[in-house]
Amino acid sequence: MDKEAAKRRIEELHEILNQYNYEYHTLDRPSVPDAEYDARMRELISLEEEHPDLKAADSPSQRVGGAVLDAFQKVRHGTPMLSLGNAFNEQDLLDFDRRVRQAVGDDIAYNVELKIDGLAVSLRYENGVFVRGATRGDGTTGEDITENLKTIRSIPLKIKRPLSIEVRGEAFMPKPSFEALNEKRLQNEEEPFANPRNAAAGSLRQLDTKIAAKRNLDIFVYSIAELDEIGVESQSEGLDLLDELGFKTNKERRTCQTIEEVIELIETLKTKRADFSYEIDGIVIKVDSLAQQEELGFTAKSPRWAVAYKFPAEEVVTKLLDIELSVGRTGVITPTAILEPVKVAGTTVQRASLHNEDLIKEKDIRLLDQVIVKKAGDIIPEVAGVLIDQRTGEEKPFHMPTECPECHSELVRIEGEVALRCINPECPAQIREGLIHFVSRNAMNIDGLGERVITQLFKEQLVSRVSDLYRLTKEELIQLERMGEKSVENLLRSIEQSKENSLERLLFGLGIRFIGSKAAKTLALHFGDIDQLKQATKEQLLEVDEIGEKMADAVVTYFEKEEILNLLNELKELGVNMTYTGPKPVKVEESDSYFAGKTIVLTGKLEEMARNDAKAAIEALGGKLAGSVSKKTDLVIAGEAAGSKLTKAEELNIEIWDEVKMLEELKK
């Protein structure tokens, strides 16, 4: 076929395949069998391979993936992608309605939409062609994920009119795709995704676009961010226009004239939640009129004209099949409920937390009981109660053992503690869990050394002490399951890099009782190096800000042990850094930062900056981080899904910032 004929045929195939895509993925009404679609796609790819210069940016062939990216570029949003304020009950909705009416009067209509549990994205079109897609990021700056978004077949690569427009939507993984993906991951002995939202986010942040293309993602577009020339006067009109242009919008939407009508609709939608083929975590209520939206405006972190009603934690009933015991790195014995598989909050749950023996006794939890399992968002499922009236007589009381399930040493209960402990320092489970803790993100942060690899290394007797990690060789690692040459090289590089970590990471990784990451940082900063710390007396430790008696006793006891001193000498000889190399906090009187001398609480999920990095940056400018909100708190920085701490800050009239404002202050 000559070039001119190829060009004409490619244009025809574009039109045909775009129509097939629209019918199948947007209208859910395919007009041809899959085999016909596949044949036309193969024809297009073949022609584009023959004539590479005829391959257009909006070609349907872009949906199969193939490009491998080096990194995601930053994208600044022309119109910020702000998060929404939350409503958790009927009173919150009535308060929202009252605020709206006080501002713009009683002539109000609300547009009610499902809150899809996925990843918020922005899609930019120039002259009708999809040119850029980005994540929300911190609301001001996101990441360019255009190539991965092109693999979502419900995103039109070319819309039905040559408009320049930016739209917002929620990319998600449908429930059937999520279940199939996790089943495949389990077959490959890979860690399953916790929920469809994590799976969608992970898929769209793959540098290899072929992986994203295989994940069967979908999208609902829910708003127009920027559009010239065409007059749209309401949210509902905007959604109708999006439909006309070929975007996929959610049809479970309605315009309500009163807040009471909204509340009634929410109750109806709650009952349908399990029937949707995608996860929802709430309902979004928006003032329908765009003129009224403009009049209401924004707070620092969210629009005043919209609110997200969040569903309460989901509860289901299932059978308790067994109670499994595990041994943590400090010897604590933790019971876990083994359940008859049940769907809760979007995932299949087979295990749930029982916390400790006292909870089992308090709730009179018995084997084979019908139990209530509760899960909200990403939290670990927990057994919230028992249906005693459904007992049949086959249920059996559960008794905690007197011996460690791993090493069979006698278990003890330390005075004042709820938990049973194994106090055998040679207990294999404690050693293994200690190694897992040592390499974890907040400790030595050795990338590639997760629980699976550590368990293998321990089982093969290649490591039994943390110092053994620094003696591992390529020859030893290459013999492990699913460890290729490249993986081994990356792992050895990561182990070597961890030697340069600042002292606080090592201290936290060693697992000294009562010393969390914050206390480890405080001690490292105060003493400067391990030699000064291990010689410190209890009195000297108590002089350190925020170090209490239990912590001081634990540190002194830890460094009195000969085996610990030998371990530290080994690590030093192996090249592990033993000094504090992190930023030194600015003295309050020397800092002109807003944070200097203030007590600050971080709450919710930060999108742009890791929480630990944000803490370190604030502390370096003289700020003091606190874990809870009180009258002494000067500032609360609220990220996504901030909860009770934000509510308390509002009650106490404490200043509240979002992540965007925090980043602006840090950049000064």
Curated annotation (Swiss-Prot):
What does the entry list as the binding residues for NAD(+)? Answer: 34-38, 83-84, 113, 136, 170, 286, 310
CDD domains named among the record's database cross-references: BRCT_DNA_ligase_like, LIGANc
The residues that the entry says bind Zn(2+) are: 404, 407, 422, 427
This protein's record includes keyword Cell cycle: no
Q: Which residues cross the membrane?
A: none
Q: What does this protein do?
A: DNA ligase that catalyzes the formation of phosphodiester linkages between 5'-phosphoryl and 3'-hydroxyl groups in double-stranded DNA using NAD as a coenzyme and as the energy source for the reaction. It is essential for DNA replication and repair of damaged DNA.
Question: Gene3D superfamilies in the record, alphabetically?
Answer: 5' to 3' exonuclease, C-terminal subdomain, 6.20.10.30, BRCT domain, DNA ligase/mRNA capping enzyme, Helix hairpin bin, Nucleic acid-binding proteins
Q: What is this protein called?
A: DNA ligase
Q: Which SUPFAM superfamilies match?
A: BRCT domain (SSF52113), DNA ligase/mRNA capping enzyme, catalytic domain (SSF56091), Nucleic acid-binding proteins (SSF50249), RuvA domain 2-like (SSF47781)
A biological process (GO) of this protein is:
DNA repair
- Organism in which the protein naturally occurs: Bacillus pumilus (strain SAFR-032)
Keyword Iron included in the entry's annotation: no
What gene is behind this protein? ligA
**At the top level of its lineage, which domain of life is listed?**
Bacteria
Mind listing the UniProt keywords for this protein, alphabetically?
DNA damage, DNA repair, DNA replication, Ligase, Magnesium, Manganese, Metal-binding, NAD, Zinc
Q: Which cofactor does it need?
A: Mg(2+); Mn(2+)
Q: Which InterPro entries match?
A: BRCT_dom, BRCT_dom_sf, DisA/LigA_HHH, DNA_ligase, DNA_ligase_AS, DNA_ligase_CS, DNAligase_adenylation, DNAligase_N
Which Pfam families does the record cross-reference, listed alphabetically?
BRCT, DNA_ligase_aden, DNA_ligase_OB, DNA_ligase_ZBD, HHH_2, HHH_5
Entries under SMART domains matching the protein: BRCT (SM00292), HhH1 (SM00278), LIGANc (SM00532)
Molecular function (Gene Ontology), one example: DNA ligase (NAD+) activity
